[in-house]
Amino acid sequence: MEFPIDDEELLDERNKLLQICNMDEQTMFYKWESWCLQRGNTPKLDLDTFKAFAKDMKFQMERQVKATLKQNPERKSIKQIPGMNIDSILGLPVKTTASGDSLMQESKPSTETFELNSSDAGRVLEVLNKELKIVTSKPSAPSKLVIVANFDLKAFNYRIMYQKLYDSSEVLDDRIELFSALTCRKYNISDEDLANPSELTQEPVVVVGRIVVESTNLGGRLNQNSILLESSRRLGAGVRVRLKVDDLPSYSIFPGQIVSVKGSNPSGNMFIAKEILPIPPLPFPSSSKQEHATFVANTNNQPISIYIASGPWSLRDDLSFSPLKSMISYVNKNPVDLVILCGPFLDINHILIRTGNITGTSATSLEELFKERVTPILSQLTCPCILIPHINDAASDHPAWPQDAFNRVALGLPSNFKCFPNPCMFSINDVVFGVSTNDILLHTSREELFRLPSHGNLFARLVSHVLHQRHFYPLFPGGSLEKCNPSNLDIAHLKLGEFLNTMPDILILPSDLRYFVKNVENVVSLNPGKATKGINLGTFAKLTIAPLELGDNGSSNHYSHRVWLRTKAEILKL
């Protein structure tokens, strides 16, 4: 994406900033979007505004340089004489060499300063439907939540690293076939009218295929000259052809995206796109009048309140799990009907777990370490809690996505805990939730190519890709090259990541990107942020869902949930 700049003076400022910060124009545009989001609006792109943006970019760069120098100072060592310590000679406190064992011991005092919950805990950072007034009265009896799993848990218990090429290719091909059928149904065309994009055509035709990067280098990125369209085996024998998007007024594409395109291939070597045909979304969930009456009775016609939080749950220099203690303490002081906690709990990338320098434990396995340190903290919860793993969870024996659920019994968790897979869709009374902890938002933001997209907001656009593609992780081959946040896709089982028959009412996508909560095409979409980043406590989300008020629905016995109209969503400081 390029800045629409006509002013020569503004153009000079942009070029200077590109040179100073050593970045390309698309990266700068992403930073501009982020800068606008932090201000809660979309500032006009003029000289004064851009200078303010440039000032912030320079300040951030200087701060990063200073932090790097502070972490790696140039030290001139003095050869030590055996038996002599210069500090003791000068009367200074003697510092012992920091080993892996002492690292944890030295860091413990710093974590105690959190005192579980600071005075800042619970401060509202962002809110959706702020104007919504939800009246809560003291119920005569506690709310009874009906939690229904909309997935087959046994299907997630597959053997990893046993992928067969044929099975993987079938899954990828079936995705194109699915969207081919949807295109025919939406635009009232027959299956025979779908064309092979690699065949020579002078007249406009409709084709369906997968966006692929043309690159000989591992980790190549999309640009206007490297877009390929891969057809299905039935319609085009899986052949890939160059896709030209120069004539499109707007687009937003990424590798793995299934698209329906109208255009022609006059040369036989390149398909020239004239229009990208939108695919109709899935319908929203609905409930019968009888089901609704049951839900109202279970909740005493009171709103449902839910906390949602995502790991990592330990600071970077210890395994005392201070953020998790803070979260559980906050929940106990401010009770809700349900808590949804996402991993990683024992982060495989944590320095102490990665190096094995874990002290003060009798555990002989990572599962036992979870039982010893995490389970006692979680057991303090008295309300229902749903645990969803992350592929970086060291206590999980299933480090591939789609990912099997935790074993509640093996981890010693009490009966008020439910362990769901990653991803999952489930219902809480009349509200359908969708959750995936694989960081599709971050990975797509690094691979996306766009021009004047329909969603100007970055977060809304990334979420819309998930909704339109009907899949929790539509990116392919995915963020497999990410060092600390890989995708670890098991291609043969990607069908487990597809949406079922309906859209979720609420979509939860934890990400390393900045927290947010938005109404994206009538789906309440949120990233609760991380419980901790480095040595600081992070954020979590709170949902307050008012009961559905039934109106006149004509002759129909089913009612749309309309969750986006009756949900107040907040991002809170931990």
Curated annotation (Swiss-Prot):
Keywords tagged on the record: Chromosome, DNA replication, Nucleus, Phosphoprotein
Q: Where in the cell is it found?
A: Nucleus; Chromosome
* The protein's role, per its UniProt record: Accessory subunit of the DNA polymerase alpha complex (also known as the alpha DNA polymerase-primase complex) which plays an essential role in the initiation of DNA synthesis. During the S phase of the cell cycle, the DNA polymerase alpha complex (composed of a catalytic subunit pol1, an accessory subunit spb70/pol12 and two primase subunits, the catalytic subunit spp1/pri1 and the regulatory subunit spp2/pri2) is recruited to DNA at the replicative forks.
Quaternary structure?
Answer: Component of the alpha DNA polymerase complex (also known as the alpha DNA polymerase-primase complex) consisting of four subunits: the catalytic subunit pol1, the accessory subunit spb70/pol12, and the primase complex subunits spp1/pri1 and spp2/pri2 respectively. Interacts with orc1. Interacts with orc2; the interaction occurs on the chromatin, is stable thoughout the cell cycle and is independent from spb70 role in the alpha DNA polymerase complex.
Classification via Pfam families: DNA_pol_E_B (PF04042), DPOA2_OB (PF22062)
Q: How is it modified after translation?
A: Phosphorylated in a cell cycle-dependent manner.
Q: Which organism is it from?
A: Schizosaccharomyces pombe (strain 972 / ATCC 24843) (Fission yeast)
Gene behind this protein: spb70
- CC per GO annotation: alpha DNA polymerase:primase complex; chromatin; cytosol; nucleus
Domain of life, source organism: Eukaryota
Give the Gene Ontology MF terms in alphabetical order. DNA binding
Its BP terms in the Gene Ontology are:
DNA replication initiation; DNA replication, synthesis of primer; mitotic DNA replication initiation
What is the recorded name of this protein? DNA polymerase alpha subunit B
Q: Which family does it belong to?
A: Belongs to the DNA polymerase alpha subunit B family.
